[in-house]
Amino acid sequence: MKRTLSILKPDVISRNITGKVNAYIEAAGLQIIAMKQLHLTRIQAEAFYVVHKDRFFFNDLVNFMTSAPVIVQVLSGDDAVHRYRKLMGDTDPKKAAKGTIRGDFAESIDANCVHGSDSEENAKNEIAFFFSRCEIFDR
């Protein structure tokens, strides 16, 4: 089984739709094998999104991700990275297909509900950013 990182962003938590989003994940055949809620510090958010530090949206992204708690999760399944990216839908919810998380729940390109790793290599690094090995339980 392959793994990927999922972050349920502050808009999911504040709108109380965590269960709905996780239902989509599980219905897609992905298992949630680790999960925790935390409130990112600015330093943590900047470190996690360092790849975007020179992009115009970096400050807004960091501000949003530190505005309220998030839920970080490790998902497991065949081709987990690709399957979760497809399930998330387009970054811009106006372009996201119905039946995807962003197509059905996201309110804007900024408050777009979820983050998912974009490659297996990044998934390993992102998972290690938030979880130690003893916090992940394969089924």
Swiss-Prot record:
It holds the Pfam family NDK. It catalyses: a 2'-deoxyribonucleoside 5'-diphosphate + ATP = a 2'-deoxyribonucleoside 5'-triphosphate + ADP; a ribonucleoside 5'-diphosphate + ATP = a ribonucleoside 5'-triphosphate + ADP. It is found in: Cytoplasm. Its EC number is 2.7.4.6. Major role in the synthesis of nucleoside triphosphates other than ATP. The ATP gamma phosphate is transferred to the NDP beta phosphate via a ping-pong mechanism, using a phosphorylated active-site intermediate. NCBIfam families: PRK00668.1 (NF001908). ATP binds at residues 9, 57, 85, 91, 102, 112. PROSITE patterns: NDPK, NDPK_LIKE. Signal peptide: none annotated. Keywords: ATP-binding, Cytoplasm, Kinase, Magnesium, Metal-binding, Nucleotide metabolism, Nucleotide-binding, Phosphoprotein, Transferase. InterPro entries: NDK-like_dom (IPR034907), NDK-like_dom_sf (IPR036850), Nucleoside_diP_kinase (IPR001564), Nucleoside_diP_kinase_AS (IPR023005). The active site is at residue 115. Its cofactor is Mg(2+). This is Nucleoside diphosphate kinase. It comes from Neorickettsia sennetsu (strain ATCC VR-367 / Miyayama). GO terms for cellular component: cytoplasm. PANTHER family: NUCLEOSIDE DIPHOSPHATE KINASE (PTHR46161), NUCLEOSIDE DIPHOSPHATE KINASE DDB_G0292928-RELATED (PTHR46161:SF3). GO terms for biological process: CTP biosynthetic process; GTP biosynthetic process; UTP biosynthetic process. One of its GO terms (molecular function) is ATP binding. Homotetramer. Belongs to the NDK family. Coiled coil: none annotated.
